[in-house]
Amino acid sequence: VIFLTPTFLGDRLPGWWGKIFPAGGIRLGLDLRGGVYLLLSVKAEKAVEHELANIKESVKEELNRDKVLLKGFENHDKALTLNFFSKSDLEKAKKLDSNYKDIADIDENNLSLSFTLKDRYITEVQTRAIDQVKETIRNRVDEFGVVEPTIQRAGADRILIQVPGASASDRERIINIIKRAALLEFKIVKDAAPNQELLLAKYGVKSPDELTAQGLSLHSGDTGQENEKFFITENEAKVTGQYLSDARLVFDEYGRPAVGFSFRGEGATRFGELTGENVGNRLAIVLDETIKSAPVIQERISSQGRITGNFTTDEAKDLALVLRSGALPVPVDVEQEQTVGPSLGKDSIEKGRLSMIVGGIAVVIFMIIFYKLQGVVANIALAL
């Protein structure tokens, strides 16, 4: 009885109770308290693409440093192929073997060098990405202030999330916080137009994919400007959200909610270089592939800035939260999503309480009838 009392009375217990008896109740699950249930599928294969992209950038830097002329790159599933103009350049590039032999099989073919990621390393990369998704989601849920969430792996590439006790008003916010990729990038704007067809025609291409060969990217815009629904930016983001030291709710000069951000050491240096080299140009603030704002750079900025948009106060708070927690390293799909009401749990608790009372009374009566005086003594001892 003493151990069960905190479960039924909770905050109604007197202050002295915890000093004498256990004050922690039984943790009630989703079926009893209601809340949020999500089953996420992690696109772990994207982690392999990201790893190949990182290898590509590293190789490019090493070859440029050694003044090796490179014709181009080709991506094939889990392989990266380097094409050279001459045999001498290929021979110079072979020294890369020692840097990547532990993670990739390296093959030579005419004027090409191919790096094929080893299966063992692919598994390691994917596992690391799934674990990082799990920890990022845990950080987001914990920072939201939810008590006792359950976040765990479910099979090879799935994550199960249960948030018991979430109020009806918080459930939608929690789901959005969990699902959001929160990939923040800063890119220089090259052009803008009310529709993408105008931009594609202007740059002589038929699809956004063809812009990549020109070092450009097409993004939709959510800036509130009707004549700027689509933007073309530089493909490479020299600064991303990984360099943020803080993100917080602020208000702009018109009193509208916004998100203020600050950079740490290397991020401040990178952001300062990006803005300093592009004074007079527009800087796109890209969130999950959508441009939220694109202000003109008036002067060099190094340490902090602001993301504006059509945010409510809660939306700005939630965006700041996910930016502080970090972006998901790979996309996730929601396979199952349920919000469970507490009514079923309330009925179960009431039935459990009633059955415990009825059962307890039945035991007391049985012991008195069967054991007489000894039964009375035993009942008193149990009560104490």
Summary of predicted features, one role per range:
Residues 26, 34-44, 155-157:
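Membrane-interface junction motifs in transport/secretion proteins
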Residues 287, 301-336:
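Extended, hydrophilic extramembrane loops/domains of integral membrane proteins
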Residues 44-296:
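Non-transmembrane, solvent-exposed regions of membrane trafficking/translocation machinery
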Residues 1, 38, 137, 165, ...:
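Residue-level signature of catalytic and energy-coupling elements of molecular machines
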Residues 18, 22, 29, 165, ...:
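Alpha-helical membrane-interface segments at transmembrane helix boundaries
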Residues 260, 264-279, 283-284, 350-384:
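Interfacial segments of transmembrane alpha-helices in multi-pass membrane proteins
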Residues 42-45, 49, 120, 312, ...:
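Short, exposed interaction patches on small structured surface elements
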Residues 1-37, 62, 215:
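Hydrophobic alpha-helical transmembrane signal-anchor segments
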